[in-house]
Amino acid sequence: VMSINIKRNQLKRVVIVGGGLGGLRLAEDLCNSNLQVVLIDKNNFHQFPPLIYQIASAGIDPSSISFPFRQIFRKRKNFYFRMAEARAVFPDKKILQTSIGKIEYDYLVFAAGTTTNFYGNANIEKWAIPMKTVSEAMGLRNAVLSNLERALTCATEEERQELLNVVIVGGGATGVEIAGALSEMKRYVIPYDYPDMDSSLMHIYLLEAGDRLLAGMSQDSSKKAYEFLTSMGVDVQFGKMVTDYKDHKVLMKDGQEIPTRTFLWVSGVKAQPITGIDGDHLGRGFRIVVDEFNRIPGMDGLFAIGDQCLQTADPAYPGGHPQLAQVAIQQAALLAKNIQKIAEGATDSQLKPFRYKNLGSMATIGRNKAVVELGKFHSQGFFAWVLWLVVHLRSILGVKNKVMVMLNWLWKYVSYNDSIRMITYATKPKEVRDRLKREQTTHLGTDLLENEE
């Protein structure tokens, strides 16, 4: 039987599931505490979500926004990282079951974020390209590039149009940003890389079910984003409910069809599920309901933060917080303090309840084109774009990466040139394939515990 292989010591153990922006911040803040910290993530690296779409359009290299956990936490005492998937929790036994065996905890924090929501549509789930992770973004990059290659050589005009149409479903920040990035690729890359192809044949459609883009931002930001995208040649359509995808066609409720082989679905998310936390504890979007201290009520030592949780105790956000990076980071910073107090035996009155401080929101649509809202201050265009760059560079982790990403962007800005338009697929050796297969079928929580040591 595999095991987590971490010795218990006299310190209380905090297990954190998920090394996104929230989980990472929590682990970092707890590293100097009097607790044993165990971080579990199914990847061995942290990925910086706001820039994932840049990989998809061959804008930056995946390694510029991915950071190995072991490197981040080098030389930390009482810190352990394990690459595994959380499967089930047994709150009464204080045990978390993972793909590599069980782990005991004193405190368990779920920070696993969200996954793409296909709303039960099997065809869309099978064919669409989601955009939540670095590997999905690389998949999209490969798809776009290999479709361009095929468009030069395919037999029929019909197939050529399918290969050159890109359909993006979902007009939130990700949809807007990827539409902008792909339209820049169409304008500045294709004429040079593919001189024998008519780039005007490439069409980018952005379909939104509602009546505006960036629903989380103000009306003027939505309007500006729409103007920017249409000026860049993106075909933005509102009131469009996508119902299915068949025979390389996106089908809509109103009967409209768009032929495409590059079909992106960024239309919604749902919280990562975990066995052992039943429906009574879940709110909308499958989010785990928590109290003002991010505790899961009625479950001793269990917490959830970030996109995965729904907290309605914040007076300014009675319906719960928006699923944004800042919420996760702020909740993590406060929970780190509260957990240390709880470990020392504090009562509720000694803990600080969470209040979200909205630092503003931003989206970038292309070079010189962004929308930024910081409180009463709204900006659109070049200044907003510079602000967007600064904010995202500041929050990126490693020093080397900040420099790399900045040089990359500056070079792109000056030259529109780009060296990462390679179609590369990672192959998995048989040993690794077999191991992954084994891990997918073991430790599902059903083999429970009684018969293990």
Task: For each feature predicted by the language model, list its residue ranges.
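FAD-binding core/adjacent interface of flavoenzyme oxidoreductases
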Residues: V1-V15, F79-V167, L264
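Beta1-alpha1 glycine-rich phosphate/pyrophosphate-binding loop at the start
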Residues: S3-Y80, A173-G216, L264, E453
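C-terminal, flexible cofactor-proximal segment of oxidoreductases
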Residues: L11, K337-E453
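Short glycine-rich anion-binding loops that position phosphate/pyrophosphate groups of nucleotides
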Residues: G22, G113-T116, A179, V269-A271
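An active-site-proximal "capping" alpha-helix that borders the catalytic cofactor pocket
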Residues: V37, L324-A343, M362
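A Rossmann-like FAD-binding core segment of flavoenzymes
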Residues: K77-F90, S183-E292, I296-G298
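FAD-site-proximal beta/loop scaffold in flavoenzymes
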Residues: K126-T156, H248-L251, E257-Q330
